[in-house]
Amino acid sequence: MSTIAESARIHPMAVVEDGAVIGEGVKIGPFCHVGPHVVLHENVELLSHAVVAGRTVIGKGTRIFPMAVIGGDPQSVHHGGEETTLSVGANCTMREGVTMNTGTADFGGQTIVGDNNLFLANSHVAHDCKVGNHVIMSNNVMLAGHVVIEDRVILGGGSAVHQFTRVGRQAFVGGLSAVSYDVIPYGMLNGNPGLLSGLNVVGMTRAGVDRAVIHRVRRAYKSIFEGTGSVRENAAAIRDEYADCEQAVQILDFIAADSDRALSSPTRGQKG
């Protein structure tokens, strides 16, 4: 039997299956479908024809627009019907036609989306992805399985991210770009194949990063990608010099971390 809060408003032409948990202030419009294992926290709003399926939890204040399908089975040949999950944080917006899939059992079974994210029309979050907070995915952005998107990333319209790829904090990916390799924090990537084109200085400035700090991060970037060694060797060589610069350290830590993918770079042949 469903648990439906007294203040929830459910249109008589919506379907809420037995077992669903509907929180206070939730609004469910006509022709919506809410599955039996779904939890909608307070003040979630489903506009007409939205679908929330699977073992999915939607955080408070999130809005889901028409024709979005949230919590569908993973699009993976390895999925055997296991009970995997999708967790979406608070105050997200999923515009028309957005799709998000649950995880796969072989990789922990969880797709996780953070808070305050904006997913524009027809964008897709595949199985086992991890999306941070304050992320913007523009129209028709596609995340393949196991992708990690860190906080405050902006992905331009029609861009596609290869499976297992990481996109670092506050990076900016231009429209129609193909992201085949990891993108450093604060990096800007454009094109197909995607290449770094410098730092997201506009984003850093908007975030209140001091101009002198931005100048230091630019110097670090130049040392990393224009030094005589590999990218990882160059990054390790400057760690002590930039130990007091938070943004530079984030870049250096990202480069040093284990990853299934190589690093995006400013030139096609350089991969870390």
Curated annotation (Swiss-Prot):
Compartments it resides in: Cytoplasm
Kindly report the protein's main subcellular placement as a broad class. Answer: cytoplasm
Known catalytic reactions: a (3R)-hydroxyacyl-[ACP] + UDP-N-acetyl-alpha-D-glucosamine = a UDP-3-O-[(3R)-3-hydroxyacyl]-N-acetyl-alpha-D-glucosamine + holo-[ACP]
The record, for InterPro entries, names: Acetyltransf_C, Acetyltransf_C_sf, Hexapep, Lipid_A_LpxA, Trimer_LpxA-like_sf
Domain of life of the organism in this record? Bacteria
Q: What Gene Ontology terms for biological process does this UniProt record contain?
A: lipid A biosynthetic process
Its Enzyme Commission number(s) read 2.3.1.129
Query: What's the gene?
Result: lpxA
Would you tell me the protein name for this molecule?
A: Acyl-[acyl-carrier-protein]--UDP-N-acetylglucosamine O-acyltransferase
- Give one GO term, molecular function aspect: acyl-[acyl-carrier-protein]-UDP-N-acetylglucosamine O-acyltransferase activity
List keywords of the entry alphabetically. Answer: Acyltransferase, Cytoplasm, Lipid A biosynthesis, Lipid biosynthesis, Lipid metabolism, Repeat, Transferase
Choose one Gene Ontology CC annotation of this protein and give it: cytoplasm
Q: Pathway, per UniProt?
A: Glycolipid biosynthesis; lipid IV(A) biosynthesis; lipid IV(A) from (3R)-3-hydroxytetradecanoyl-[acyl-carrier-protein] and UDP-N-acetyl-alpha-D-glucosamine: step 1/6
* A family per Pfam: Acetyltransf_11
The species this protein was found in: Rhizobium leguminosarum bv. trifolii (strain WSM2304)
